[in-house]
Amino acid sequence: MYRFSDYDVIVVGAGHAGIEAALASARMGEAVLLITQTLDSAGRLSCNPSIGGISKGNIVREIDALGGEMGKLADASMIQYRLLNKSRGPAVQAPRVQADKFLYSQLAKHAIELEKNLHVFQDTVIDIVSSNTNESGYVEKGSVQYVKTERGREFSAKAVVLATGTFMEGKIYIGEYESPDGRLGERAAIGLGPALAKKGFTVGRLKTGTPMRILRRSFDSSLTEEQEADEIMRPFSFSNAEIHRPYAKCYITHTNQETHDIIRENLHRAALFSGKITGTGARYCPSIEDKIKKFPERDRHHVYIEPEGLNTEELYINGLSSSLPEDVQDRMIRTIPCFKDVIITRPAYAVDYAYVSPIQLSSDLQTRRIEGLFLAGQINGTSGYEEAGGQGIIAGINAALFSRSLKFKDEKYVPFVLKRDEAYIGVMIDDLVTQGVDEPYRMFTARAEYRLNLRHDTADERLTERAYQIGLQTKEASNRLKEKLLTREKIISLWKDIKITRDLIAKNPELKNHIGKSLADALHDPQVSLECICAIDENSKDYSAELLESAELEIRYEHYIAVQNRKIAKVKRMENTKIPADFDYDAVSGLSTESRTRLKEVRPETIGQASRIRGIRPSDIMLLSILL
């Protein structure tokens, strides 16, 4: 083995988690090494060529507010924009874009190459070496020392972030065919999963999948419905004022009874049902054969046709993820009229891979078994680019802070942790480390109890100053936030001062019930639109649509936000009551056996976190509260 020079932080994997982790650590001034099999695959949109969605779009904006890259990459590569749930309340609205997958990956690679504190080495990591390792490889409270690669290199570091995606012991399935790949045609990283298990980590397997891709010219769009999109593209990144990009169309069609019959006749040939796949899949992203089996009463399922980019003729067939053999895939898709003469360029396939149970992590995404080892992304049992990116930036921040604490003895390691009332990222990580996973974890607005406070448009208000304080965000971003808040307050003050007169009602009849009130008061009426307010306030033309909408929401929902803030304040005491890392649960008399077992397994950091562990009795939480 040849030992290379020391680094502060090593990041393994250049997917969405690895990119954010590596860039965050490097931008905080640490010397970072990113190890990946091939840099050309950096930031690959392996499945759906889209970024964002319900709650996922909020995470992208949170990553950006923290100083991450995903929002900027999405802005620079978007080819369609939609604000989802526009007809519903702001707490569940979120942006989603179609992205040019090749441009996105190219820009991600370039961002990595431009970062001055970041080096890249293209190889496969097969082991993490730590202190306190016995002869059998088991580790009891060790510390990271170095990583080993497949080609015999060793790299030392103070902290290591593992962001392996579907590549750790990955295997793809197409009917009877199987291959040790992380993606079709890209070999898996073999060796690291068993190495982690040998050290004492609980390692399992999860499953995901992707649909076929087809050639555009073999598809008849006239037999489909065009999917509506927003006319104006809006940015994810708070650093971008507006977006001007070419637009691409998406389409909707449906399966039919003939499609379903072919699938039913061949279920025994699907890897998902033949016993080949051992990993558990996400119930919220089922394969087409899973849909047919679970919902036999349905006579059709939606299929979305989405472009993979502006300079490719391949289309992504959203809704037809499958592990069926290629001959069955070809027959089933041709039963849909618009695909009668289809040419499949890449088959659908399933992939299962190794993951590490996340209840073995602390809230900073550091493993409790090996100090200085952080995990992010699908290795923690999550699904989705956005979830991976959100974990990646937190792992990268904490790896940098941990490294600093070892370099500078007067700098104590204080983990950067986002709470459930601060960010969707905080909700996700708390769910992972407190409850673990038994299927790929996907973020939903329903998981967040304080979602009105976690709107996508407020991500900068919640997170930018915190990121600036640790050296990740820029002074420019901090100043931009201050300017936004000052301007919004100015708009709100103006609307509070403008009174509604009879003359104004003549031109704006929707204000007829608000004579004598201010424009701000009128906004509490759901029948009064922002457009009506702006028609009266001539100064509104000087402000961006985003800023005006932000002012509107602050006024319209101020009472609901106040109620939510009171609820947050009530639970703060439990969230702030720390449980010592070495707390002896066996010494607590009266604690139920089930609660004692779960508490010892999860090792919650606060009483609040303990209360969210599955199987913990309220009486046991009360007992711990009294003791602490």
Curated annotation (Swiss-Prot):
Binding-site positions, NAD(+): 281-295
Residue spans crossing the bilayer: none
Main location, first listed in the record: cytoplasm
GO biological process: tRNA methylation; tRNA wobble uridine modification
Cofactor(s) recorded in Swiss-Prot or TrEMBL: FAD
Family statement drawn from the similarity comment of this UniProt entry: Belongs to the MnmG family.
Name under which the protein is recorded: tRNA uridine 5-carboxymethylaminomethyl modification enzyme MnmG
Native source organism of the sequence: Treponema denticola (strain ATCC 35405 / DSM 14222 / CIP 103919 / JCM 8153 / KCTC 15104)
